[in-house]
Amino acid sequence: MGIQKVMVIGSGLMGSGIAQVCAQAGIQVMLYDVAKDALVNAIKSIGWSVGKFIEKGKLAEDQDTIMARIRRITEFHDGKEADLAIEAVFENIELKREIFQRLDTICHPKTLIASNTSAIPITELAAVTNRPGKVLGLHFFSPVPMMQAVEVIKGAATQDDTAAAGKDFVLQIGKEPIMVNRDVAGFVINRINFPSAIEAMNLVEQGVASVEDIDKGLRLAAGRRMGIFETGDMVGLDVTYGAMKAMYEESGDPRWYPPLLLRRKVKAGHLGRKAGKGWYEYNEDGSRK
């Protein structure tokens, strides 16, 4: 039967995207956030995105049918019937640990608990639960409705059938699983992408090339749909910083240490599109100036 009910914790860019692709796949979704306003905005964003997919002929169902599968919740216990709970909050290990402890308490013993973390070790999150064998990583990429890959990460205690269920779920929602068999900092894709991003930031700081020209070069010469800095603004500079910092703290490897330019941007509040300014500047509607 596959996964029938999913609880998504966090209604930001990633959480709302995960909720959307689950609903589009026929799964009942309980979208949790402590902030009611955030949930309202998330539903509006999801509705707009679903509408665009329908306009392009990529979805057979109507918007109302898909949106009816998403239920907003502000109490944890309202998600207790989930077959799978996916945590999708920002990269703060203490917050994630707290969420995993609460999920472990309220969810059925058979419920799988996953994190969308891009860098924090799954093993550390599993350790605060009484079901480490049923904990895994499901790392989606932004924007979730558009990106096809999902990393399925095994922690040290993750059971084989849990990883297999994670793989099946990814296929169920129309994505492609990337199986990560060891719980290393940054998993697979970020360990490949981050060195390029760090070098790009260093080149800007050294005055070798501009943000615009580096992004243009990557689009035209490397076949990327978006440049490194365009992607960074969409994801959020604070998210990138948090992921790099987590990888550095986990591994002790200085190559993952967030570059000075990124650290300064984050301290200044230039967090990307959501803040109106990051590597680029944005209008109120999110379009680039």
Predicted regions and their residues:
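NAD(P)+-binding Rossmann beta1-loop-alpha1 motif at the extreme N-terminus of oxidoreductases
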Residues: 1-49, 56
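Rossmann-like NAD(P)-binding element
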Residues: 52-112, 120
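Rossmann-fold dinucleotide-binding core
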Residues: 112-183, 190
